[in-house]
Amino acid sequence: SASAFWKRSKSSLKKKDYNDFFKSISNDNDGSLIHIHTQAEGTLDYSTLFFIPKKAPFDMYNADYKSGIKLYIKRVFITDDDKELMPTYLRFVRGIIDSEDLPLNVSREILQQNRVLSKIKSNSVKKILDEFMKLAKNEDKYSEFYEQYGKPIKEGLYQDFENKDTLIELVRFKTTKSEDKVISFKDYVKNMNDDQKTIYYITGS
């Protein structure tokens, strides 16, 4: 069970421990930009450990991209080939989901309709987006992140209605006044002239 690193107390783990573990599960020597470690108990009992690689996965824009999430049940490995574990626009996320509430003999068909897993996924997406919001407070770090993952984040606006308010704060745009910098929608609106009533934009296919 990969020694269930994600079950260890967060306070006992250092940044190097997380980086070493990320490299061991991803074969990515560039390291991770951030990690998101959650240990939930209560209505649902599960652990998740997600990483955002510093560099976008090579197959991120391939239709047959490989899932980056490994599913465990009670520390027993189940699958690393289920794209339903994370929304398509977060396909660059790497990591582990480990549930204590699912039966070990669960089938793929049941997994896709399972309420427990659906709730874990929903909670995880919110947690990941919250971390992106924290990252966005540091303009330099967020620029580094957005350069790699800006396009998938924009896809989220079309795919994830539940989290659209957060996603609209995360997307960035180039404007005729911003030169090479990207700015948030909120900043664009704030900088509009008083007499400007319309926003014009160009889309690319």
What kind of feature is each model-predicted range?
Residues 1-205:
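Conserved GHKL (Bergerat-fold) ATPase module
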